[in-house]
Amino acid sequence: MKILGIGNAIVDVICKVNDDFIIQNNLTKSTMKLFFDENEFKKLISNLKIEKTVSGGSVANSIVGISQLGDKAGFIGKVSDDEFGSKYEEGLKKENVEYFYSKKKEKLPTGTCLILVTPDSERTMCTFLGTAGKINENDVSSDAIKKSEIIFLEGYLWDEGEPKKAFDKAINNANKVAMSLSDQFCVDRHKPHFLNLVQNKLDITFANEQEITSLIDAKNFDEVINFSKQLKKLVVVTRGEKGAVAINGEEVVESGIQKNLKIVDLTGAGDLFAAGFLHGYVNKLLTKECLKKGTEMSSKVIQQIGARL
């Protein structure tokens, strides 16, 4: 297998809202908030008009994109034996992704992410992890990890105790490890651990500019470049309208964005960028071509509702 993803198995519920809704519900725009009270989460959804429901989860979105590009890909994530769990499995099988988990009856429902899209196409996420947050080391197949060229992990796995053990097992058995830092607040919650991972455990780090800047307390992007050079590992940073940059030792490669796009929803931009880049990487393309592939995938997904093509 080329790439095996391990992450939160979550169904995305997409709704359009105005900025007032974000403010009234004490949410921080363009970030992800975790909900631990299922009733509070249901109350938030109850008054909204649902635009679309689709299988999601950051790494899972990337893995689907990788499969769509023709690479053999798999995913490990935990769902419950309920309506959303069945929908989740079906969504992966439809995209030819090998799913290394069988849904079971659980006390908690399948994880759900409420994605609130504001008129500027930014997305604010509210997540109830449910069963997704209970993935543990017993759910992770050592054999599948060892047979994969790269495993791809998400920082969100650190938001619950049990997934951390699954995370460690994956890293200890992997040939190569790539990870997305996931979210600026996620970085802030786990900064010392993430910094250790980036410096000592990961082969490839994916981050946006805000995440990597927060991680190292950088005052400007030159500090990000210098930090990344010293790692002598691959660091890939998306910078919004400024494009993306990949740093690997002294090699610094930049890429622009595709212009004149009709942006509808930025939800899957980072996920699909990672998909395109990793596709290029495992097929041994030059770094510049990997960035180009990432930009192409990202540009496609932001012109539609939802994080999957």
What are these regions (language model features)?
Residues 1-76, 86:
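Glycine-rich phosphate/adenosyl-contacting loop at the front of the ribokinase-like
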Residues 3-9, 15, 23-30, 47, ...:
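Conserved phosphate-binding/catalytic region of the ribokinase-like
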Residues 50-58, 103-107, 267-268:
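Active-site nucleophile and cofactor-binding loops and adjacent substrate-binding regions
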Residues 73, 99, 177-178, 235:
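Hydrophobic beta-strand scaffold residues
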Residues 91-108:
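A glycine-rich helix N-cap at a beta->alpha junction
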Residues 100-105, 115-161:
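Conserved phosphate-binding/catalytic loop of the ribokinase/pfkB sugar-kinase fold
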Residues 144-146, 198-199, 229:
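A short, aliphatic-rich alpha-helical micro-motif
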Residues 150-225, 242-244:
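Conserved beta-alpha-beta core of the PfkB/ribokinase-like small-molecule kinase fold
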